């Protein structure tokens, strides 16, 4: 299987000519763009404009034969020397160059190469008059299936999804993207609680700052080597269980933008073949609690961003 993330990072070392995206918007003249993610569920190409799909997403092709379908694949997946491969558009070369440029610009904001989905959204937000996003929330699960070999990493683990949602949150007001918003309660958490034995449940946080516990997890540098110590492993598992069951109002009470950004590094490894992963990313039991924690962190960023945007809107209204 191609190591697409390794392939992508090679492009950070290469020289790239910079495109004027404003001029490119005039050249391509996108009026309506629909971006279809790889989440589950049926979908059809948009009836107007251009539809973007990823890595050959399947659809009933004869249902809308007259519409333009553009496929974007990352270079590693497509076994190409380029960072992206664009098929189905007459200006595929320009789109490939623009996607690469945006991805390189996003990388330092994320600490890793961005997903093709976020890269396309950020680019199209600058190139198209109207952008709709479907079957995508930038929140794939880090819960490892029981049949995944212990030495294999989840493909989605190489991206900083909390960081991607942080960047996308600022674009949401200008996009048609109903699936992006998170509910305050992470519903899968309820079934996880029901399945747990009483002796497995760590003490819940009532008044303490959950970010302090995340900081302890970060300071412990809990790599695979440390997992050889059963006591350390069990202690950190209990931390994860505690955090996964912490009520959202407690998270919101202590959430600060800088803290939220600092926690992002706990939940991805952009180079798992050469850089050891935090043990809980590779552990079937521990990984079951990561989505609930990430959901709380992402929801905190969502509410803080919404509140900030509302304050700015009120200031502008009062000043006019």
Positions of PLM-derived features:
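Metal-ion/cofactor- or nucleotide/acyl-coenzyme-handling active-site neighborhoods
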Residues: 2-320
């Amino acid at each position: 299987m191609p190591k697409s993330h390794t392939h992508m990072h090679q492009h950070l070392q290469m020289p790239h000519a910079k495109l004027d995206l404003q001029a490119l918007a005039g050249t391509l003249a996108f009026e309506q763009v629909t971006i279809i993610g790889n989440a589950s569920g049926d979908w059809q190409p948009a009836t107007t404009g251009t539809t973007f799909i990823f890595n050959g997403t399947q659809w009933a092709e004869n249902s809308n034969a007259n519409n333009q379908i553009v496929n974007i694949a990352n270079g590693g997946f497509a076994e190409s020397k380029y960072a992206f491969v664009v098929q189905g558009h007459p200006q595929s070369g320009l789109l490939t160059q623009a996607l690469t440029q945006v991805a390189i610009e996003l990388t330092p904001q994320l600490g890793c190469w961005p997903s093709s989905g976020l890269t396309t959204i950020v680019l199209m937000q600058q190139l198209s008059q109207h952008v709709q996003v479907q079957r995508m929330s930038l929140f794939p699960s880090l819960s490892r299936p029981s049949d995944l070999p212990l030495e294999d990493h989840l493909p989605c683990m190489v991206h900083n999804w909390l960081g991607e949602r942080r960047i996308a949150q600022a674009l949401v007001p200008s996009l048609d993207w109903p699936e992006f918003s998170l509910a305050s309660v992470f519903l899968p958490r309820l079934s996880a609680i029901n399945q747990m034995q009483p002796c497995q449940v760590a003490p819940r946080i009532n008044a303490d700052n959950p970010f302090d516990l995340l900081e302890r997890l970060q300071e412990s540098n809990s790599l695979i080597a440390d997992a050889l110590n059963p006591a350390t492993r069990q202690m950190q598992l209990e931390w994860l269980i505690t955090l996964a069951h912490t009520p959202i109002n407690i998270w919101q009470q202590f959430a600060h933008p800088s803290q939220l950004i600092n926690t992002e590094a706990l939940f991805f490894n952009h180079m798992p073949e050469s850089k050891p992963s935090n043990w809980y990313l590779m552990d079937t039991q521990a990984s079951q609690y990561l989505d609930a924690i990430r959901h709380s962190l992402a929801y905190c960023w969502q509410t803080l961003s919404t509140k900030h945007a509302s304050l700015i809107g009120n200031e502008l209204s009062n000043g006019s």
